[in-house]
Regions:
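A structural signal for beta-rich interaction modules in eukaryotic proteins
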Residues: 1-111, 115-295
Length: 295
């Protein structure tokens, strides 16, 4: 399939995969999709796009990078590493989501895809790089992930471009003795799936909010929340993090009597890059606390 053919194709059909895990509390999940036949299909959970040649079952999961394997080739992770299982020749193209904002010509020299098998690692040249995905031709599967060329990235580091980011909110159960509650902010690149992060914060309640923002790597950010007792840490550097743990970037300590808080993420120039009024109450009458609803 040529690059021109790819551009002329209709948008992919979206599907919601079946989530599988060894136990309800397991942080490791797999995604399963019964593909109905040939076509282009996009996973609503991971952003992956599969160009299918036939009806088949797809099973895939995010696995941990081994950066010591990448370093000799001068590569660093630029997305999650996905282990994909399906019959040979069932998939003809794979589209992996990226978070870059740089122009397409620059991305051609910056991004590539690694294919890791039991026999070793190979570097795949992209067929095309769009505003959202890196596209490669595939025939058989094991593990695939987007990488950056270390030398190219740092050659242009003096004139950095932001990446597409996201801010995820997780509310911890309240401490009834101290009448305090902690709200965690997890600041990540756009191409980290929400479900991967939620599985690492299963004792917290995820609070939906507008996610998108633009972030600069290796620059520090602060959080402003006027109603907070304390925000920890006072500042934090933003780096690309592709798991597996997804620890909180910031912790905001609040009174349990607080129902709504305004939170702003600010850059080094004290400019808001993300801001939201966060509702800490559930949908029931009188705004009962979300933990009392078991949400």
């Amino acid at each position: 399939m040529s690059e021109d053919d790819t551009k002329l194709m209709a948008p992919p059909s979206s599907f919601t995969p079946e989530l599988q895990s060894e136990s309800p509390k397991s942080a490791q999940i797999s995604y399963r999709f019964m593909c109905p036949g040939p076509g282009r299909f996009q996973c609503s959970s991971t952003g992956l796009v599969f160009v299918m040649a036939q009806k088949t079952e797809l099973v895939y999961k995010a696995i941990q990078w081994n950066e010591s394997v990448l370093q000799p080739s001068g590569k660093i992770p630029a997305g999650l590493l996905f282990k994909i299982q399906c019959p040979e020749d069932a998939v003809c193209q794979l589209h992996l989501p990226h978070c870059e904002t740089k122009d397409a010509e620059f991305l051609k020299s910056l991004l590539s895809v690694v294919h890791i098998t039991d026999d070793g690692m190979s570097i795949l040249k992209p067929l095309e790089i769009t505003d959202t995905h890196v596209i490669v031709t595939v025939s058989h599967f094991s593990a695939f992930g987007i990488v950056r060329a270390f030398e190219v990235f740092y050659r242009f580091f003096s004139n950095p471009c932001p990446v597409h980011g996201q801010v995820l909110l997780f509310l911890r159960p309240p401490n009834l003795n101290s009448q305090r509650q902690n709200l965690h902010l997890v600041v990540l690149s756009r191409n980290v799936p929400l479900e991967e992060v939620r599985r690492r914060h299963q004792d917290s309640v995820y609070i939906p909010a507008p996610l998108k923002c633009l972030l600069f790597e290796d620059q520090h950010y602060t959080v402003d929340c006027p109603t907070a007792f304390i925000v920890q840490p006072k500042k934090a550097d933003f780096d690309l993090d592709f798991g597996p743990n997804y620890h909180p970037t910031f912790e905001i300590r609040l009174s349990t009597s607080i129902k709504v808080v305004t939170i702003a993420l600010r850059d080094q120039k004290n400019t808001d890059v993300w801001k939201h009024d966060v509702d800490l109450t559930g949908p029931g009458p009188e705004g009962n606390h979300i933990f009392r609803h078991g949400l």
